[in-house]
């Protein structure tokens, strides 16, 4: 059977749905606090959570928006979000299974869009951003949050390698400049950007994804062989825990 990228993503995340709903890294953080402020100021009527994962952005937006649509490629992830929303009494969250690059929605059907820790899995980065622009009303706000590459090849190669070994559905963590350029090409005008450093506890990070012992050892081997510069940038600890760079870009749909 042919294993497409979409099937690889669904296989990778379907069995891990509960782990992402329960994940502390995904359920809290400075980025969610910043996003909450933007959502409150926007007071959306219909908001889209693009690549919902464990649904934490949807649960946040449901407190302010009249309606929220949570989209994810994984049917199991969507089912977990629907169950959690029901358990929390959030009746204004609808779930839809679809790829970011081919959204089953009308043009301009949403007045707010948020996308958190999803774009690095997309087969077509620009295609997903173009779809986000298409389904969002002109002049409305979109917020994109993701791990980003620090840029220099020395750091970028290490980052992409450990990400891919841990999660074989990983495509790419983009640089800040790649994000800004892709948003501009896709119809967005960036209006603000914030960055954070996020610590990844190695045992939790690998367990959440169900990374095999063989692959976890491979990551530790890469870390042990890393240059002093790489070790310093990612603040690699003795147990393999390390720091990631995270960005949040607020943009207007042109």
Label the model's feature ranges:
Residues 54, 190-254:
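Conserved Class I S-adenosyl-L-methionine
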Residues 1-43, 56-60, 77-80, 143-165, 204-206:
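Conserved class I S-adenosyl-L-methionine
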Residues 126-138:
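A short glycine-rich, Lys/Arg-flanked "PGG" loop and its adjoining helix->strand segment in the class I
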Residues 117-118:
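Short catalytic micro-motifs in class I SAM-dependent methyltransferases
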Residues 48-50, 54-102:
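Class I SAM-dependent methyltransferase SAM/SAH-binding core
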Residues 172-186:
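Short alpha-helix
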Residues 114:
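A conserved beta-strand element that flanks and buttresses the S-adenosyl-L-methionine
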